[in-house]
From Swiss-Prot:
This reaction introduces a second double bond into the aromatic ring system. GO terms for biological process: amino acid biosynthetic process; aromatic amino acid family biosynthetic process; chorismate biosynthetic process. This is Chorismate synthase. It comes from Acinetobacter baumannii (strain ACICU). FMN binds at R125, S126, S127, N238, A239, G278, K293, P294, T295, A296, S297, R319. Pathway: Metabolic intermediate biosynthesis; chorismate biosynthesis; chorismate from D-erythrose 4-phosphate and phosphoenolpyruvate: step 7/7. The keyword Amino-acid biosynthesis applies. GO terms for cellular component: cytosol. Pfam families: Chorismate_synt. Its cofactor is FMNH2. Belongs to the chorismate synthase family.
Length: 363
């Protein structure tokens, strides 16, 4: 299987399955000398891990990360960093009924057609459990970018199902299981997700992720534009079906004289482009939004076929998120951090000696 790595100079490779022994990652390209402990990674893993609220999957995994290489006496050595998370709460028997059938809306059918075989336990490699390693690797990137440049990467949920958050208070985001910055929207989110679980169905979600204080100049036109790589990274997250940069799809109804992000000697007058111009960071806040589809793992029976290509019905058992967007915020933050870290290293490799004609304007 190809496609298990992302990045060029900051390169993350993951492996492992939902019900296997564990999850692993190799993170290459981390500069030497970064103070790094397992606790630095655990903070974000704890934000993502399952079983933390009644609004997410009840699979209880501690997701304790182990650093097995690349760190000596508390600092990175510049060699590949090996990471390991052991699985502890697999219940593979819950998936015995789908060994011969395909769950609609999942990768079961396509994996079987492509590889001729699949690990049906919890979705195997296609499970969102794989994203735990992305979060661990992304935490390394977030720490380096924060210490080196003061970059702040953070996200919040703006919509669950048909319920929309109207306000954003960053102080509220860590205070609820939805990563929502609108305290008034939280009870509506709770009621909706509770109702969905009782009905045996699920819903989608929308998230916004911001990267503040990103220096101007990161991005490699034309095929490796910063926004192109961000979109690629976000689309690699399970269930993501849409990505917006800046104003996103709203630009279809906008006019050039309103949205061209005029600039003066004192700074930019707007940020409709989302902090990226010509595929290169402008120094403004990078704004990304993603839409996640409803999980197809629901307790309502659905039509499918079996390995004999016969029509049948399937009822998905197991422990699943009624809304996958609830735990997606730290995953999206991690993917944005990984892309930014990679582009910093690439920019430094070619352009470290470039002297612009004037200092960057205020974002």
């Amino acid at each position: 299987m190809a496609g298990n790595s992302i990045g060029q100079l900051f390169r993350v490779t993951t492996c492992g399955e939902s019900h296997g022994v564990g999850l692993m990652a190799i993170v290459d390209g981390v500069p030497p000398g970064l103070a790094l402990t397992e606790e630095d990674l655990q903070k974000d893993l704890d934000r993502r891990k399952p079983g933390t609220s009644k609004f997410a999957t009840q699979r209880k995994e501690p997701d304790q990360v182990e650093i097995i290489s690349g760190v000596f006496e508390g600092k990175t050595t510049g060699t590949p960093i090996g990471l390991l998370i052991r699985n502890t709460d697999q219940k593979s028997k819950d998936y015995g009924n789908i060994a011969q059938t395909f769950r609609p809306g999942h990768a079961d059918y396509t994996y079987t057609q492509k590889y001729g075989f699949r690990d049906y336990r919890g979705g195997g490699r296609s499970s969102a459990r794989e994203t735990a390693m992305r979060v661990a690797a992304g935490a390394i990137a977030k720490k380096y970018l924060a210490e080196k440049f003061g970059v702040v990467i953070r996200g919040h949920v703006t919509q669950i199902g048909n319920e929309v958050a109207e306000k954003l208070d960053w102080n509220e985001v860590p205070n609820n299981p939805f990563f929502c910055g609108d305290v008034d929207a939280v009870p509506r989110f709770e009621a909706l997700v509770t109702s969905l679980r009782e009905q045996g169905t699920s819903c989608g979600a929308k998230l916004e992720i911001l990267a503040e204080k990103v220096p101007v100049g990161w991005g490699e036109p034309v095929f490796d534009r910063l926004d192109a790589d961000i979109a690629h990274a976000m689309m690699s997250i399970n269930a993501v079906k849409g990505v917006e940069i800046g104003d996103g799809f709203a630009v279809a109804g906008q006019f050039g004289h309103e949205t061209r992000d005029e600039l003066t000697s004192h700074g930019f007058l707007a940020n409709h482009a989302g902090g990226i111009l010509g595929g290169i960071s402008s120094g403004q806040t990078i704004r990304v939004a993603i839409a996640l589809k409803p999980t197809a793992s629901i307790t309502t029976p659905g039509k499918t076929i079996n390995l004999n290509r016969e029509d049948t019905d399937v009822l998905t058992k197991g422990r699943h998120d009624p809304c996958v967007g609830v735990r997606a915020t730290p995953i999206a933050e991690a993917m944005l951090a990984i892309v930014l870290m990679d582009h910093f290293l690439r920019h430094r490799a070619q352009n470290a000696d470039v002297v612009p004609p004037f200092a960057p304007i205020e974002p």
